């Protein structure tokens, strides 16, 4: 039983609707529009919303959307046939009204489609009932029944052939092991000569061995060296004392060499950092987050130089290109198949996950199928333009994270703004936490760093080093004696959730604006550590949960994000589990134009990329520019 069936235009006008079991179809259809149609995720024609399964079909020629909804616990095999039949009949019946494509004509039009729909629904249900059951194949008709007889016939003939081949190979191996270089005709004679001692005698054997040795040396050319080595090895070596190895920093070094403690000047470690402040800070405005720029001046100059030649080529070869024009033609899947295959391979080469590349190309095919092209548009340009629009739309997800605005809102409520960083091992969580701390300090917010990585050795010391250097960049003297950055740590082996709770309470009492919680790196399959992370997030309810991921990963990004979200949902004790809110993409300066990880991560989670790490100084932090990333992704 269907819950509803609705037909509406891409402009939002509902042309016709059938209400079955469900009272209203507004909520599920709006969720479909927000999550699938507007986000360019049309690779799969089904969508699940709460207890309903929605299937849809796009008519790109007339800009129509056909949606059917039913309970997801039901298995209705006739839904695909029904939606195709309704699409075909509705388009043919009201072609004149739809071709006007004006909102006023669609509003004034009367689409009496109830009786036709009920007839198609009844036919679809009956066809599914009377569908012929699949009959089991007989054993006599299968390949397995024919295989034993054929294999017996083949193996009898093959055994003799294999025996002959094996005998030949064994004979060749024996001849090779003896080192004979003579032909097959003379070989038996030589063997007989070797065996016949009375005819040849001992001298003949020596001559034969010497002759074979010379032939072997001439053939391989390395026997002389080996023989010389063997003669050298026969001579006994004079035993001498081994020279003692002198280590650069050995035990005999003096105390000055072994002293690794930081030099103290007037008892302040900040004075030792004064000469390295510019190196630590980096160049650029720290308080202003710049957009990511993936293009270079060389690429721009190349594109500018190629534009005139391209225009000349199109004008000069106009008549030769007329065969490739598809003006005033509706696109079909056969037309786009070869282009989409090239686009899919291009995306995979640019580090997009393989499954996501397939879904993107399928979404573009559904979007363009049946669409009438322009006069001088080719299939390649149309598909490429549609793919670029889809990629830009994916990188601009539903929610936009504005940390500065949210921190000011938390200040008005007199509470600290809490951010939790999570991710796998070695992706740069602590480093990018320090970059974000510097960015917040440059904007005038005080930061408390909570060292909740009680698992990895050296994690607390790493954060202590960052805190000391950030304090040197923003000393209390510049802020009226107020401590702008401080580390809250309780050592190793403690409960991370308890440390985070104490840090938030300490920040509230001391008046800190932001609390940045550093967590231990963990693999997505490590159940105990994922349970501890879910406990930390559930107990402390942070304002923002950021997943830190590398820009180097491809298919692994999909597995990491899916399993992190699944683990947070499974191990959470709350009724509505808290999932990942945003993404921090690190090591973006090491991938050139292979920026596909940004597409993979955003497509999987529908969450925005909040920050992008582009270097090793505190200023190397950027915000994502969707158009620049897509331009780098589509660059050949």
From Swiss-Prot:
Residues spanning the signal sequence: none
Subcellular localization: Endoplasmic reticulum membrane
Binding positions for GTP per the UniProt entry: 423-430, 518-522, 586-589
Residue span of region NG domain: 417-634
GO molecular function: ATP hydrolysis activity; GTP binding; GTPase activity; signal recognition particle binding
Membrane topology (UniProt): Peripheral membrane protein
Bias (Polar residues): 302-312
Compositional bias ranges of the Basic and acidic residues kind: 137-146, 153-165, 217-238
Organism the protein comes from: Mus musculus (Mouse)
UniProt KW Transferase keyword: no
InterPro entries: AAA+_ATPase, Longin-like_dom_sf, P-loop_NTPase, Sig_recog_particle_rcpt_asu_N, Signal_recog_particl_SRP54_hlx, SRP/SRP_N, SRP54_GTPase_dom, SRP54_N_sf
Record-level GO cellular component terms: membrane; signal recognition particle receptor complex
Region ranges (Disordered): 132-205, 217-246, 280-314
Recorded family membership: Belongs to the GTP-binding SRP family.
SMART domains, per database record: AAA, SRP54, SRP54_N
Subunit organization: Heterodimer with SRPRB. Interacts with the signal recognition particle (SRP) complex subunit SRP54.
Entry-annotated residues carrying Phosphoserine: 177, 295-297
Coiled coil segments of this chain: none
This protein's name: Signal recognition particle receptor subunit alpha
């Amino acid at each position: 039983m269907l819950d509803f069936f609705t037909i509406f235009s891409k402009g939002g006008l509902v042309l016709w609707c059938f209400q079955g079991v469900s009272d209203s179809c507004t909520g599920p259809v709006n969720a479909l529009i927000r999550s699938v149609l507007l986000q360019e995720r049309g690779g799969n024609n089904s969508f699940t919303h709460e207890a309903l399964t929605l299937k849809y079909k796009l008519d790109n020629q007339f800009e129509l959307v056909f949606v059917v909804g039913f309970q997801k616990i039901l298995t209705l095999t006739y839904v695909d046939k029904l939606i195709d039949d309704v699409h075909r009949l509705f388009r043919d019946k009201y072609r004149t009204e739809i071709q006007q494509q004006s909102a006023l004509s669609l509003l004034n039009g009367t689409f009496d489609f109830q009786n036709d729909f009920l007839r198609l629904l009844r036919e679809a249900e009956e066809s599914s009932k009377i569908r012929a059951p699949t009959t089991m194949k007989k054993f006599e008709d299968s390949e397995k029944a024919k295989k034993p007889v054929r294999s017996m016939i083949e193996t009898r003939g093959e055994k003799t052939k294999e025996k002959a081949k094996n005998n030949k190979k064994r004979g060749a191996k024996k001849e090779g092991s003896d080192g004979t270089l003579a032909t097959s005709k003379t070989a038996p004679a030589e063997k007989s000569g070797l065996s016949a001692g009375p005819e040849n005698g001992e001298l003949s054997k020596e001559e034969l061995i010497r002759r074979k040795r010379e032939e072997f040396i001439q053939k391989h050319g390395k026997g002389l060296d080996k023989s010389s080595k063997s003669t050298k090895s026969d001579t006994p070596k004079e035993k001498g004392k081994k020279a003692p190895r002198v280590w650069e920093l050995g035990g005999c070094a003096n105390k000055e060499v072994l002293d690794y403690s930081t030099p103290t000047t007037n008892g302040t470690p900040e004075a030792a950092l004064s000469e390295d402040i510019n190196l630590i800070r980096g160049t650029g405005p720290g308080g202003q987050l710049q957009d990511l720029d993936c293009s270079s001046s060389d690429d721009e100059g190349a594109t500018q130089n190629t534009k005139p030649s391209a225009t000349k080529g199109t004008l000069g070869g106009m008549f030769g290109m007329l065969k490739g024009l598809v003006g005033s033609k509706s696109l079909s899947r056969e037309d786009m198949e070869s282009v989409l295959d090239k686009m899919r391979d291009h995306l995979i080469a640019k580090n997009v996950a393989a499954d996501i590349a397939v879904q993107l190309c399928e979404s573009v095919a559904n979007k363009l199928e049946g669409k009438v092209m322009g006069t001088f548009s080719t299939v390649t340009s149309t598909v490429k333009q549609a793919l670029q629009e889809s990629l830009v739309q994916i990188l601009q997800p539903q929610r936009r994270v504005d940390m500065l605005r949210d921190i000011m809102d938390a200040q008005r409520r007199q509470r600290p703004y809490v951010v939790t960083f999570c991710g796998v091992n070695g992706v740069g969580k602590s480093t990018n936490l320090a970059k974000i701390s510097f960015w917040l300090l440059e904007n005038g917010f005080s930061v408390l760093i909570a060292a909740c990585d009680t698992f990895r050795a050296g994690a607390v010391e790493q954060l202590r080093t960052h805190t000391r250097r950030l304090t040197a960049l923003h000393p209390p003297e510049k802020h009226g004696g107020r401590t702008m950055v401080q580390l809250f740590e309780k050592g190793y082996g403690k409960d991370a959730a308890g440390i985070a709770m104490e840090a938030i309470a300490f920040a509230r009492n001391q008046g800190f604006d932001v609390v940045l919680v550093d967590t231990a790196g963990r693999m997505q399959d490590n159940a105990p550590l994922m349970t501890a992370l879910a406990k930390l997030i559930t107990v402390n309810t942070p304002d923002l949960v950021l997943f830190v991921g590398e820009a180097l990963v491809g298919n692994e990004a999909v597995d990491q994000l899916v399993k992190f979200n699944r683990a947070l949902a499974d191990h959470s004790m709350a009724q509505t589990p808290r999932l990942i809110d945003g993404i921090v993409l690190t090591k973006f300066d090491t991938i050139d134009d292979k920026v596909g990880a940004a597409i993979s991560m955003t497509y999987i989670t529908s969450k925005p990329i909040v920050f992008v790490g582009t270097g090793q100084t505190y200023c190397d932090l950027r915000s994502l520019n969707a158009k620049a990333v897509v331009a780098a992704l589509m660059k050949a």
